[in-house]
C-alpha cells in the first residue's frame, strides 16, 4: 500500500488530499502541519480583525474532513529536512515520517527587510497566519497608533481590518502607488482615494530609514511615532526543504505540469511552487488560492498513480476595500480596450488574437468569463468579443462553445 506524506496544511494540501483520494481510497496519508490548526481560509484573517468573521468560520473544510479522508495529521509538526534516498521526512524532534510519494505544500513566509533598529521595536507583527491575526488583535486598542510598512494586498487588508479600532493608521511604501504589483497609477488612485476617505494616511514613495523604539525615521525626513508596527513588505516562497535536498529551486520550487519536482517521488504545490503561467507562457510563483488548490489536486492525483496536468494557472486577484471592489488577472500586454464609468474602470488587454489580462475596478461582475478566456486561450475570432467588451455574458459564445466552456445546454 502506497504511503503519502504532505508537508503543509493549507489549501494546496487539501487539494492534494482530495486528489489522492480520487485515485487511491486506502493508502495512508500523513499531513505535517507547523500550525496548530486544521486547514483554514487564510484571506479571512483580516475579516476576523474587522469583526466580520470569527475563528469558528475560518476552517477550509468541515471538522470531519481529515477522518473522512483517512489522514493522520501532525499539528505543530516541524519538518526540518527530507532524505530522498531513504524516502523520509525528518522532524524537529528527531523522528522521521516515511513516504512513497511526498508533496511539499509549505507556502510562503513574510519577508523582513534588515531595517536598522528593528530590534528596538516592542510590538511588531506580520499578518500571514491565524496566530499573527490573534497576536495583532491582542496588541491593539482604541489608543493605538499603527504603522504598516507595505501598501500591497496584505498591508492594505490589515489597514481595513483594524480601521475604526485604533487611533490612527499610517501606511508607507517605497512604491509611488498602492497595490503597485497589480494596478497601474490611475486604477491605484481610485483605491487610494477610498482608503484615504476612511482616515488612513498613505506615505507613498517613502519608507523607513531606521527605527528607534516607537519612532520611525523615514527616508523622506519625517519622523512617525507609533505603538504597533506591522511589516507587510512581501513574502518569499518556502523552498529550503527542496533546495537542501538538492532539488531545483528559483523564486519557488520548480515543478512540471504534473507538479513533480526534480527529486524523484517529490511533488510541490501552492505558494511554494513555481509552475506554468498560461498568460505569461513561462513559469512563476502564482500565490493565490484557486491555483494552490488545483496544483495540489494535480499533485495528489499524480502521486497516487493517476495522470492530471495543471497548465492553466494565471495570476489573479479579487480584492475590495471599504466597498470598492477590483479584480485583475493575467498580464497587461498588447492592445488595451478601456471603458470608464463613475468610479469604475474596465481594461482588457489583447495580443495575438487572445485575451491576455484585465483590470476591473468597480465593475467586476461576471469577471469569471474573462478569466476563462485567458485560462483556455480562447481565440477571440471564435467568439463575439465586441459584445464581450461591453458585457461579459455567455451569449457572446456560440451554443456549442457555451456547452463546452460553461456546461450550458446547446
Language-model features, listed with the residues they occupy:
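Mid-to-C-terminal Rossmann-like scaffold of FAD/NAD(P)H-dependent oxidoreductases
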Residues: 2, 22, 272-368
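Beta1-alpha1 glycine-rich phosphate/pyrophosphate-binding loop at the start
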Residues: 2-72, 159-183, 369
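C-terminal catalytic lobe of FAD-dependent flavoproteins
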Residues: 3, 224-248, 322-402
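Short hydrophobic core segments
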Residues: 7, 97-107, 149, 226-234, ...
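Rossmann-like dinucleotide-binding cores of NAD(P)H-dependent redox enzymes
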Residues: 59, 153-209, 291, 310-318, ...
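A conserved beta-strand/loop element that lines the FAD pocket in flavoprotein oxidoreductases
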Residues: 67-83, 196-208
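Glycine-rich dinucleotide-binding loop and its adjacent helix/turn
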Residues: 106-165
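FAD-site-proximal beta/loop scaffold in flavoenzymes
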Residues: 120-141, 214-217, 222-298
